[in-house]
Structure formats: C-alpha cells, structure tokens
C-alpha cells in the first residue's frame, strides 16, 4: 500500500528521442502503448452473446448474478424508480449535471449537419439528406466509478440528432437489493427525459442491444428489449470485444481501449499542473496511458519530483502508481517543439493538452487527437464533465483516422439523385459507353431503354441514339 510521504524513485519511465531522425514507422513504434490481448476476452464473450441471443432475459439475469453479484427483479428499470432517483439527488450534484447538459446541448445544436444539393446541369441535381438513426442503445459503464457524465455524452448528441428511440444499459448497483442501477445515473436519465433504462452491464448488455431479448418473467413482457440499429458508449475490454463481435450487423461508435492523455509542454509550463493532469488521467484505470512530450529536461525532472509528492497523497494512489509506471505511460524527451508535435501526432492521444508558450500555433499543427485542450486552464476533466465537448473519444491511436462521439455519430448521410428526362438524356450515350467498358452492358441498356426502341440491336444502336438525340 502507498502511504503518505514522498517517494524516492521516479515513477514514470523516460523515452529519449533526442538526436534521432526517426522514420514514421519508427516513431509509431516508439510510442508507449500497453499490450492489449483480446483472444482470451473473445473466448469469454462469444458464449455470452450466443446465450443472450438464445435465452434472452433469462440469460441476462444469470449473467448479472454471475458478474455483478445481484439478480435484478426488473431488468428494465421502472419509470417510477427513475423519477424517484431525481427527487433524492443532492442539489449541488443536480445543478452540476444540469449545467453540463445545458452546455452539451448548446454545442450539439450547432453540430447538426445541414442538407444540401448540387445542380450539375439543367434537370440534374444530387442532394444529400442527413437522416437520424432510428434506434440506439447507449452503454454506460460501472466498475471502478459511477459515470453519469457518460449518460450525458451519449444521450445529448443522440437527442440533438433526432434519434426516435433511445435505450440505456448500465450495471445494477451491488449495494441495491432490488438490482437497480446507481441512483445518480438514474437521476441523470430523468433530467434528460430517457425512460428506457436497463439494469444490465457488460457483454450481456451489448448482446441485448444487438439481438434484442425476449422476456422470461411476467414483468418482462413478451419482448424485454427490441434490437437497436447502433450501440455507443465506453466500457471495459469485454464490452469492447462484444461490440467488435456484433459490429458486422449492428453499428457501433468504436472499439474503445483504456483512456489516455498526451501533453505537449515546453519550458513555460507549470510542472505541478502537468503532474496533476497526468495523475488525473491515471486515476481512471491501471491501464490508462499518460504521456508527456517535452524538450525540457528541467520540466521532466520537476514533473517527476511533483509526482513523487502527489501520487501517495491522492485517494486512488495504488491505481495511479500502477498506471503511471506501466509501459503505456512515459515522459518522452525530444529535441524541440517540432519533434514533440511529430511524436504527439504519432501517438494520436485520446486527449491532448497543449501547454506551450504559443499554444495556438501548436494547435494548428495537430493532425491526430481525439480532442485538443488548449492552455493550462483547459484541463481534461473540464472536457470530461462541463466544457460542452464530448468525452467519448477515440483511443489506442485510432484518432489517426477516427473522431469522437457527436451528433454525426447518430445520423447518416443519404444522397438523393434527382434527374429529369433531359438531364439523363444528356448522359445516356456516355453511361452506355462506360458500362460496356466494364463489361456490364445491361447497365447501359437500362438507361438506353428510356430513349431508344431496341437497345439490344447493336447493329442499329448508334443510329437509334442519333434519332433519339443522344448523340
């Protein structure tokens, strides 16, 4: 056990990139990452998915008893329990949640994409409509902490997108004899107006959303839960594996790994604040990644000293120490700001803080990050709770090609092709030529049939095209 006092040894390892002209592949390989084996998780999760698919609510109750050590009487939380949770919510916590919701809704309202159209010629238009996904399942994890903030981050953009049907699954609280979820989570659902909530966690919750679940007891009804079109929300490796396994036939936001922070800092940064920010992320999980990129050995040394003082004094000291001393965390020493930026882009952090003299200039050069936190007064916990931004972000380097959760996550763009007779007529001969070149003549014949008498008479086709005004 870690106790009050000052630690003697440095906590974080050093990765020294100075004096090295690394290729892109070498830079990617040098970044600190935890080894994430998924084969064992897959072997454990697949039978859970199959059992829920087959037995529905009966399997869900069995798995809740096995994994969460409680057998919920009502897998679907009664609406009265959701309302009651709000009446007993601490007023200060309620005010914080409501402010978070207000800010998240303001940002989400501006994220709603607009339909548009392009006129290419007379009678030739292509439009794009953004259509909300009809039914979405939102997963809110339990485990080491309670996450009402995850309810907000998932539900608010879905509501802004216009999703018709929202369902939330979250594990039952182990200290609740009835098997109800945490009351703060239920109260947050009440504030957001979400009343379809299930006391189901883990891989079994993902299975319920993906396949739906038939009832097994009278209170369940014939159908406990209808299948959804998309599943969003963070979770542990078993939740992530389950999402991956069902993603062939139901949409998912991402396969999320452990949370992570990257910080670019120069000699102007405050080392005590840097240490506090690294600790704040490490608090999430023993596998959480915390990485500092700096060209200042003085800053690196002072951060190590601050960590020695701070880590033993934080409540979850053992968890934090395990995370910061793990292979997924490091202080990366660079030759200068340019190399720090290159390394940060290679790392592609879920959260990237910029604590440098000219933060705006650095922000403009960031290509890969789930979210960017500019300056010392924009720490990651601000984004976790209250900034208005979304905290469901790509992890494990996937910010190189993926984005965080937003209104767009819950919508799909659909193109509408609107050509009239003259618009198609102007292209008919060219479409036919294109189709023939790909050995798909029926494609061309389909178009020509609208203008010529016999598109199959190749001997007279060119003449027919001329008579029809296609040439």
Curated annotation (Swiss-Prot):
Catalytic activity, EC: 1.1.1.23
Cofactor(s) for this UniProt protein: Zn(2+)
Active-site positions on this chain: 350-351
Positions annotated to bind Zn(2+): 281, 284, 384, 443
Signal sequence range: none
UniProt-annotated binding residues for NAD(+): 139, 204, 236
Chemical reaction(s) catalysed: L-histidinol + 2 NAD(+) + H2O = L-histidine + 2 NADH + 3 H(+)
Residues annotated for substrate binding in this entry: 259, 281, 284, 351, 384, 438, 443
Pathway of action: Amino-acid biosynthesis; L-histidine biosynthesis; L-histidine from 5-phospho-alpha-D-ribose 1-diphosphate: step 9/9
Binding note for cofactor: Binds 1 zinc ion per subunit.
One GO term of the biological process aspect: L-histidine biosynthetic process
A GO cellular-component term linked to this record: cytosol
Keyword Metal-binding annotated: yes
One of the Pfam families matching this protein, by short name: Histidinol_dh
GO molecular function: histidinol dehydrogenase activity; NAD binding; zinc ion binding
Family per record: Belongs to the histidinol dehydrogenase family.
PANTHER family: HISTIDINE BIOSYNTHESIS TRIFUNCTIONAL PROTEIN, HISTIDINOL DEHYDROGENASE HDH
Function: Catalyzes the sequential NAD-dependent oxidations of L-histidinol to L-histidinaldehyde and then to L-histidine.
Name this polypeptide is given: Histidinol dehydrogenase
